[in-house]
């Protein structure tokens, strides 16, 4: 059955010359969803409805983005205004302080300062000359010091002192000579002093050589110390480089032992110290190879050699046994008294 009237539906997209591929790309670019590209009535209606919904959603997104953009612009404008105000404050501060600096950098003021400085220099013309003289004097003194005390010394120098051996001086040169004399006051002086204040009395000094328990001995002094005086003598042979701690400790213990004898009211024996590094000939004559070592002598003979480190109490008992007739201490059990002769040492004269 054929109806008298026929209806045709034409797609507007196709009539306008658009291809399906261009329509698809356009819809994808605008984020529209197209479910069907058929150009029938049902497809066109469905496409129109979905596109309408997507257009509404895109409008909402545009409005939201617009609000965010407006808020961001407001915040940025506020920050910009704050920074502008801070810059203005800094400029004001610079202007306030710049006035003072400008006054200091004024060329007229600088000329005045230079003029006053020149006037002061002209009033005292000897200042620069004195400085030059001082520099010349300093240079002369420095050259003299370098000549007297050279920084580099040749070890093979024939004028090198034997007692120095790297030290540059010997302790005996400070303590061996009596530099202070004991002088008695006259009666007239005593009467005059008694009339005045008692606090202003002269102090009588005594040299350090009288109170030192151990005295340093050289090879040149050996013969006089041993053979001219036959009283008891103890010889401490030490080495400053070999076992330095033990050498120092042994010397301290020996000084304490001598102090014990003093406290007992007895005259302590003489005690000398020989430096093995300096007095090599004397050490070889004494046949000492282990340091430290103490040799007990009396009347030109060697009574005992102590090579171990003893305490002050043990050393005081050994001294009491050999020199004061005390009982034999336990530390000397099994030790036989030797009668070794004290050796002679030839002192070569340069």
Curated annotation (Swiss-Prot):
Phenotype reported upon loss of the gene: Seedling lethality due to deficiency in chloroplast development.
Presequence extent in this chain: 1-48
Example of a GO cellular component annotation carried by this entry: chloroplast stroma
Keyword Plastid on entry: yes
Keyword vocabulary terms for this entry: Chloroplast, Nucleus, Plastid, Transit peptide
Compositionally biased residues, Acidic residues: 82-93, 186-200
Region (Disordered): 78-107, 182-201
Protein's name in the database: Thioredoxin-like fold domain-containing protein MRL7L, chloroplastic
């Amino acid at each position: 059955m054929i109806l008298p009237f026929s209806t045709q539906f034409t797609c507007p997209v196709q009539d306008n010359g658009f291809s399906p591929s261009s329509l698809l790309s356009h819809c994808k670019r605008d984020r529209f969803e197209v479910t069907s590209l058929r150009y029938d009535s049902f497809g066109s209606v469905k496409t129109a409805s979905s596109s309408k919904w997507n257009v509404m959603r895109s409008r909402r997104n545009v409005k939201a983005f617009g609000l965010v953009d407006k808020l961001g612009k407001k915040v940025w404008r506020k920050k910009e205004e704050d920074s502008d105000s801070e810059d203005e404050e800094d400029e004001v501060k610079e202007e306030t302080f710049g006035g003072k600096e400008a006054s200091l950098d004024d060329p007229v003021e600088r000329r005045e300062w230079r003029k006053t400085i020149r006037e002061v220099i002209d009033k005292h013309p000897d200042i620069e000359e004195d400085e030059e003289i001082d520099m010349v004097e300093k240079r002369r003194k420095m050259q003299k010091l370098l000549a007297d005390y050279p920084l580099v010394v040749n070890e093979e120098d024939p004028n090198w002192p034997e007692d120095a051996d790297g030290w540059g001086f010997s302790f005996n040169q400070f303590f061996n000579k009596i530099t202070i004399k004991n002088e008695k006051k006259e009666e007239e002086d005593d009467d005059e002093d008694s009339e005045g204040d008692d606090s202003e009395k002269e102090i009588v000094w005594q040299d350090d050589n009288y109170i030192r328990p151990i005295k340093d001995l050289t090879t040149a002094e050996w013969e006089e110390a041993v053979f001219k005086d036959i009283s008891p003598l103890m010889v401490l042979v030490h080495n400053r480089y070999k076992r330095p701690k033990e050498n120092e400790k042994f010397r301290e213990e020996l000084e304490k032992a001598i102090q014990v004898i003093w406290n007992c009211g007895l005259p302590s024996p003489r005690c000398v110290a020989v430096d093995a590094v300096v007095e090599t000939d004397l050490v070889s004559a004494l046949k000492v190879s282990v340091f430290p070592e103490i040799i007990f002598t009396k009347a030109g003979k060697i009574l005992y050699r102590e090579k171990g480190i003893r305490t002050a109490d043990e050393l005081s008992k050994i001294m009491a046994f050999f020199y004061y007739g005390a009982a034999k201490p336990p530390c000397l059990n099994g030790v036989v008294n030797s009668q070794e002769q004290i050796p002679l040492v030839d002192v070569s004269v340069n």
